[in-house]
A protein has these predicted regions:
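Conserved ABC ATPase signature
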Residues: 133-140
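Helical segment within the ABC ATPase nucleotide-binding domain
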Residues: 173-186
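ABC ATPase "signature
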Residues: 218-219
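Conserved ABC ATPase "signature" region
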Residues: 100, 104, 111-129
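Catalytic Walker B motif of ABC-type/P-loop ATPase nucleotide-binding domains
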Residues: 158-162
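Conserved catalytic motifs of ABC-family nucleotide-binding domains
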Residues: 154
Length: 267
């Protein structure tokens, strides 16, 4: 039997008296693009932080490709590439220097480091812009640079927290085209959070919809829409489950920073 890429069992975490994640059970299959959806404060980012070992689970159990997150944190980290909400690229460095920095942090062997940096930049379509200073990049290019930083260690699981928040539709599409191509070329598993239902419908194999710390709906976008009724969209499913609507924000690099700050505050 194939081991799940991610398995969460009765996963919970609280901040003071607030239960951010409340008994989450979840399995993600190797090679799939899995979307974790929900409004601000639903528990999405908290769940990702527990999977990535950045936050200990108060209760429950997590494995990544069969490796116990609580007992073998460093082994789990070697399996994961993570792009958080907060900007991780240094605007004073070139694209190549940014990715090389992450190669050193991930202990990519010195003998192959330059080649791995070139490979990661090529995967995200930045090979021709690699020697430009990152502060001159557009918002979409910054996001692709962050993807390269996460990919330089050849992870088996790529975790993306709101990867297109604050970008205009063209830049959003460009980022997703790269994510999709990377999954096709490498077989990598992708776990992503997003506020954009159209992205989840188009690019995710399955989605889980979180609200108040719990998973309220789980399945393929098509199945969830069919279950709701003829003509339904994933946004309709969201509104039924949460009684709310997602707000979007589009723009350049300043919008990216502002949107990420808001999402990080609200969870």
């Amino acid at each position: 039997m194939t081991e799940p890429a991610v398995r969460c069992t009765e996963l919970s975490h609280s901040f003071g008296t607030t239960r951010a994640v409340d008994g989450v059970d979840l399995e993600i299959s190797p090679g799939e693009v899995f979307g974790l959806l929900g409004p601000n404060g639903a528990g999405k980012t908290t769940t990702l932080r527990m999977i990535t070992t950045l936050l200990p689970a108060a209760a429950g159990h997590i494995t990544v490709f069969g490796v116990d997150v609580a007992r073998r944190r460093m082994a789990v980290r070697r399996l994961i590439g993570y792009v958080p909400q907060q900007l991780s690229a240094d605007g004073a460095l070139t694209g190549r220097e940014n990715v090389a920095l992450f190669a050193r942090l991930f202990d990519v062997p010195r003998a192959s480091r330059d080649a791995e940096v070139r490979r990661a930049l090529d995967l995200v379509g930045l090979a021709d812009e690699a020697d430009r200073v990152a502060k001159g990049y557009s918002g979409g290019m910054i996001r692709r640079l962050e993807l390269a930083q996460a990919l330089v260690s050849s992870p088996r699981l790529l975790i993306l927290d709101e990867p297109t928040i604050g970008l205009d539709p063209v830049a959003r599409s460009a980022v997703w085209e790269r994510i999709t191509q990377i999954r096709t070329d490498t077989g990598m598993t992708v776990l992503v959070t997003t506020h954009y239902m159209d992205e989840a419908e188009q690019y995710c194999d399955r989605v889980a919809l979180m609200h108040t710390g719990r998973i309220r709906a789980l399945g393929t976008p098509a199945d969830l829409e069919t279950d709701l009724g003829p003509g339904s969209t994933l946004d309709d499913v969201f509104r039924v489950v949460t009684g709310d609507r997602l707000e979007t924000d589009e723009g350049g690099i300043r919008s990216v920073r502002a949107a990420r700050r808001t999402a990080r505050r609200l969870g």
